[in-house]
Amino acid sequence: MDIRNRRALRREADAAVAANTGDPRLTLVVYVAVSLLGALAIAILRTILGNRIATTGGLQNLGLQAILTTIQTAAPLIWAIAMMGLDLGRQSVCLNMVRRRSVEPRSLLAGFPKLGGLIRAGFLQGALYLLIMILAVNVGSIIFMATPLARDLYAIVADLALNSEALYEALYNDPEFLNQVFSAMLPIYPIVAVLFLIVAIPVFYRYRMVNYCLLDQPRNSALVAMGESISMTKGSRWALVKLDLSFWWFYLGLALCGVVMYGDVILETLGVALPWNTTVSYYVFYVAALVMEGVLYYFSLNHIQTTYAAAYEALRPKLQPAPTGGVVLGNIFDLAKGQKDQ
């Protein structure tokens, strides 16, 4: 299969879902329900803990406040890590469907055994993006200061440029002066953003298949999986970009869900008052966004993610057969059961 033939990839994805002997629709419903209801539960927990912290005062309750604050901070992080494993399991489900293997809801657990490798790969990629951002900020600052874009900034700090103590004093103690400096530096932000994207987008597509490599070869390290992704996507990264762009409607839908989720903040910014308190407003828009996201996932996620799995199959070296011992096996539980029966 040719990665550049997006229609063929989509047809393969639809055929894989339709031909699956398991229950791909129920598996999708379980994934959507767990991910969205879990997010809602975490939001409710944070609200309850926040109210409890606000009403817990006094020196004698400092220990309780510390515990509640720790739980409030740690709960979203723990949930995010759990969702990484669930999302990886979801990718393994789609890869199984492309390989004509039966899937069922428990197949979603297949990503958790490789969660450590996924976290390490994410950390390495995050460190790389941070380095790119640091370079973009430094280069962008040089470009900004060396062009006429910085003339307003020079005019503002001209009188204080030779007196570092006075300059620091003005920056720390004069809010109006600080606002003028920030306003004069506004052109630097698009410069840095463009420089970052120029480098970060190609890097992103170099590592686009890391998750699938981790699933296929669970014993490989994160670095090995990243290297495999680089080799696999070489010469096909533009095809992956066009594949992403072909799903513009899906990503636009996700963006719309994000706008709705922050509808209370947007309306407040516009000066629109709602007939209930801020907590109710938050949850009205939050639940509405989750419902929209659930509908979008239900009708499109199987097709989209299985198409990406088909793209991985098209890029995977054909001389190397698909492994039979990887985490990607949705029927890993069936294999374990068979060994137990023996």
Predicted regions and their residues:
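Hydrophobic alpha-helical membrane segments
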Residues: 1-342
